[in-house]
């Protein structure tokens, strides 16, 4: 079962792994020493309605916590470096557009399925929550021509972009993995940044991007979890990669 085909919660169409990830973020927020504070995931989980126990267990809490913090740090560093154009690919119930302290000129594009984006935006709007940056939803499936939809929504491929594919790449078929990287590379201006978590036994993303003039680095998932003092038991054997286009 992947994030692309896992069954959704009743009446919402939101896939179970996205909901499980939101539950893990809720648990981290309520822990004694949270790596981040995400007050909005609880709103989304509540709005989604009842879940089966096995659905909530799809995401490993310690791994999700460390991964969320790692991507938070990536975004904040990119923003501090002057990147004002942010693209989140298939973010699910991610709430960074509402919870991170973005600079005033930041524009955040979220590319995801229409029902997912509508559910998230409507739930948070009803709760009186407003984004902390200019928020632009791009309702399109990643299997479709999402670069065209992204450009139509106001994205500028001439400006440096911070790209993020969190919890996505390893769940794509190999052909779609290649297509995703090719499109990101094609629409990335010099100085753009990228962050992804990938399968340790999957394609060599670092090598692929380095061959296309990206300066890349990688960290094994257990090392990221150790950095943030989270238990790696049961966590995927992933690799966190990030880099900058030269």
From Swiss-Prot:
- Into which family does the record put it? Belongs to the UPF0677 family.
State the function annotated in the UniProt record.
Exhibits S-adenosyl-L-methionine-dependent methyltransferase activity.
**Which species?**
Mycolicibacterium gilvum (strain PYR-GCK) (Mycobacterium gilvum (strain PYR-GCK))
User: EC no.?
Assistant: 2.1.1.-
Which residues does the annotation say bind S-adenosyl-L-methionine? 112, 141-142
Q: Name one Pfam family in it.
A: LCM
Upper lineage is: Bacteria, Bacillati, Actinomycetota, Actinomycetes, Mycobacteriales
Q: Which GO terms describe its molecular function?
A: methyltransferase activity
**Annotated GO biological process:** methylation
Which terms are listed as keywords in the entry? Answer: Methyltransferase, S-adenosyl-L-methionine, Transferase
Query: Which top EC class applies here?
Result: transferase
Task: Tell me the protein's name.
Answer: Putative S-adenosyl-L-methionine-dependent methyltransferase Mflv_0168
Q: Does the keyword Hydrolase apply?
A: no
């Amino acid at each position: 079962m992947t994030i692309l085909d896992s069954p959704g919660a009743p009446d919402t169409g939101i896939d179970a792994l996205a909901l499980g990830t939101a539950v893990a973020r809720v648990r981290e927020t309520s822990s004694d020493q949270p790596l981040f504070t995400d007050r909005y995931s609880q709103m989304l989980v509540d709005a989604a309605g009842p879940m089966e126990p096995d659905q909530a267990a799809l995401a490993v809490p310690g791994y999700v916590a460390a991964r969320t913090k790692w991507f938070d740090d990536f975004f904040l560093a990119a923003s501090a470096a002057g990147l004002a154009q942010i693209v989140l690919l298939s973010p699910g119930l991610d709430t960074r557009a509402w919870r991170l302290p973005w600079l005033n000129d930041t524009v955040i594009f979220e590319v995801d399925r229409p029902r997912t984006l509508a559910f998230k935006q409507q739930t948070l709007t009803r709760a009186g929550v407003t984004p902390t940056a200019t928020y632009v939803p791009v309702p399109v499936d990643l299997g479709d021509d999402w670069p065209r939809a992204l450009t139509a929504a106001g994205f500028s491929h001439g400006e440096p972009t911070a790209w993020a594919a969190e919890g996505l790449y390893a769940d794509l078929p190999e052909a779609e993995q290649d297509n995703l990287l090719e499109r990101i590379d094609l629409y990335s201006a010099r100085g753009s940044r990228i962050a992804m978590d990938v399968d340790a036994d999957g394609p060599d993303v670092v090598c692929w991007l380095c061959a296309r003039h990206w300066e890349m680095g990688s960290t094994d998932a257990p090392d990221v979890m150790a950095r943030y003092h989270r238990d790696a038991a049961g966590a995927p054997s992933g690799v966190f990669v990030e880099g900058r286009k030269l």
